[in-house]
Amino acid sequence: MPKMKTKSAAKKRFKITGTGKVLSAAAGKRHGMIKRSNKFIRNARGTMVLAEPDGKKVIKNFLPNGL
């Protein structure tokens, strides 16, 4: 059976750390910033670590060979 391919969209959106955690950009920053609090905008600026169950799903289904 051939190897499962890595999803190209997932390569661009997620990064796996050395310890196996999955990093992604914070959500909610596309539009509508005027009604968001300054704290929300500041916290959503960088990357965030996905919850462990979500990270395992991403690795299993979309990034089987890592990055």
UniProtKB/Swiss-Prot annotation:
What UniProt keywords apply to this chain's record, in alphabetical order?
Ribonucleoprotein, Ribosomal protein
Family annotation (InterPro entries): Ribosomal_bL35, Ribosomal_bL35-like, Ribosomal_bL35_CS, Ribosomal_bL35_sf
List GO molecular-function terms, semicolon-separated.
structural constituent of ribosome
**GO biological process annotations for this chain's record?**
translation
Superkingdom of source: Bacteria
Report the PROSITE patterns cross-referenced here: RIBOSOMAL_L35 (PS00936)
**UniProt GO cellular component terms:** cytosolic large ribosomal subunit
| Family according to the record | Belongs to the bacterial ribosomal protein bL35 family.
**UniProt protein name:** Large ribosomal subunit protein bL35
Organism, as annotated? Mesorhizobium japonicum (strain LMG 29417 / CECT 9101 / MAFF 303099) (Mesorhizobium loti (strain MAFF 303099))
Q: What is the lineage of its organism?
A: Bacteria, Pseudomonadati, Pseudomonadota, Alphaproteobacteria, Hyphomicrobiales
